[in-house]
Amino acid sequence: MTKYALVGDVGGTNARLALCDIASGEISQAKTYSGLDYPSLEAVVRVYLDEHSVSVEDGCIAIACPITGDWVAMTNHTWAFSIAEMKKNLGFSHLEIINDFTAVSMAIPMLKKEHLIQFGGGEPVDGKPIAVYGAGTGLGVAHLVHVDKRWISLPGEGGHVDFAPNSEEEAMILEILRAEIGHVSAERVLSGPGLVNLYRAIVKSDNRLPENLRPKDITERALADSCIDCRRALSLFCVIMGRFGGDLALTMGTFGGVYIAGGIVPRFLEFFKASGFRGGFEDKGRFKDYVHGIPVYLIVHDNPGLLGSGAHLRQTLGHIL
């Protein structure tokens, strides 16, 4: 008889829940709920389990916020809860609450070739560290290492490191944004809101008044070639994505590969392919040769967060991935 666990991927707007076959890791019965419609994450879980008439004893839910102890307070939502109390209330034997990019990193060993698009470099080296990052509402970062038949995710808040410009144009962007917001992290330029910041700074650098555009507007105008400022912003976004990925590669020696997740890049995939992304990735001066062979992959799996939550839980329960 198949034994299932509950897995989830929760962001600031939606909660996506599914079942994971503990033996195989297969994800099924995925459903998305609006976080605005429920008073708590526990309430959403109860609704999901009732709707699917399933009894589970184990669960793992990825959440887009730092997980530093028993108390979890979501960054972009009002939900806050005790992991131990939620586990008790649901009657679970195991309940793991992990960072969203911990989940994405744990999905990597489960991905197949059709879930990846490669951007330069050679073949990944088995046993070497892996980096994963992705731009969405924010900028998520994690690393992954393989030790004694176990995958260990190394989460953090790497998206909040300083934005490090490496060209006159990027230095100009930093100067303008610093005058507006003070500290300029990488996330301030590598995210949906970050794309807007790039556009605004580019326009303001010419002493003009920027329009009130959304990330979607900037992308659409850039792809239609109807706005030179939007096209410059999107081009610069791709280059800085490359620079940041190259920094991750240098920091951990990620010869196992660098992986890009998140919902932004797939929206302009052909533009990204032709951009200066890989040039930015390898623009490391004396260490260009060091990163030259490191492969970069775009993850195109529909639900890496759910897949990785399942992998994390299965490994916790003693399965070898």
Swiss-Prot record:
Coiled coil: none
Disulfide-linked positions: none
Transcription in keyword set: no
Major localisation: cytoplasm
Transferase in keyword set: yes
EC number: 2.7.1.2
GO CC terms, sorted: cytosol
InterPro entries: ATPase_NBD (IPR043129), Bacterial_glucokinase (IPR050201), Glucokinase (IPR003836)
Pfam families xrefs: Glucokinase
Gene3D superfamilies in alphabetical order: 3.30.420.40, 3.40.367.20
UniProt-listed PANTHER family: GLUCOKINASE
Similarity section: Belongs to the bacterial glucokinase family.
Protein name (Swiss-Prot/TrEMBL): Glucokinase
Species, as recorded: Salmonella typhimurium (strain LT2 / SGSC1412 / ATCC 700720)
